[in-house]
Swiss-Prot record:
HAMAP family xrefs: eIF_6
Protein name: Translation initiation factor 6
GO molecular function, one term: translation initiation factor activity
SMART domains to which the protein is assigned, alphabetical: eIF6 (SM00654)
Species: Nitrosopumilus maritimus (strain SCM1)
Family: Belongs to the eIF-6 family.
Length: 221
């Protein structure tokens, strides 16, 4: 598994706009085809152009693993229908006032760390659609668990100030080793600059050598 630097819309915040699992990368409408082909090749997936809630913010608004994808209630019916048709996944909608689902849920194929802002009913929906166990807990004082942690099925990166005991809890839930890291030259909101599936890790173009070493420990060792 490689770690590769990339940028999107001339910036390093690749995780805001893109979502990926082991089969598909979801990219915004109008995204350059040459870049789409490159990303798909690196990640070993097919690419699909879509919008969510008529925006480009796919990574921020949805959460996807290899079993399902969860959309916010602001997603349009035609977007839901398109993803249902094109993806061999359970497709669900979370009926919550919180719509940036990628910011409040961190999931792999085994577990999901969910923001305390979401309800027990929301957790049940997450569990049903993604096929995972859930836990609700802040990370380093943040309710936005999906912003400060990224996981695949072999590792996870978490906010540099995350509590060690919490990391053990999350490690048991997700079934992976977890390492503290930042991204893009000191940004602690790791999901903004990482795309992780089980084939490759793509990071924002400003990510430093020491950060790549931390991510190597998280995902490759």
């Amino acid at each position: 598994m490689d770690i590769i630097k990339f940028d999107v819309y001339r910036g390093p915040n690749i995780g805001v706009y893109i979502s990926v699992n082991d089969n598909t990368i979801l990219l915004p409408m109008g995204f350059a085809k040459t870049k789409a082909e490159k990303l798909a090749k690196y990640l070993g997936v097919n690419y699909l152009f879509t919008s969510i809630a008529n925006t480009r913010l796919i990574g921020a608004l949805c959460i996807m693993n290899n079993k399902g994808i969860l959309l916010p209630k602001t997603a349009y019916q035609n977007e839901f229908d398109f993803l249902k048709k094109e993806l061999d996944l359970e497709v669900g909608v979370l009926d919550s006032k919180l719509t940036a689902l990628g910011n409040v849920i961190c999931a792999n194929d085994k577990g999901a760390v969910v923001s305390p802002w979401l309800s027990k009913e929301d957790c049940q929906t997450i569990s049903d659609v993604l096929g995972v166990e859930t836990i609700q807990k802040k990370i380093a004082g943040f309710n936005q668990t999906g912003v400060v942690m990224v996981a695949n099925n072999s590792g996870a990166a978490i906010h540099p100030e995350a509590d060690e005991e919490d990391m053990k809890t999350f490690s048991n839930l997700l079934g992976v080793k977890i390492e503290q890291s930042s991204i893009n030259n000191g940004i602690p909101y790791v999901s903004s600059g990482i795309l992780a599936n089980n084939n490759c890790i793509i990071v924002g173009s400003l990510t430093t050598g020491p950060e790549i070493m931390m991510l190597t420990r998280a995902f490759l060792n």
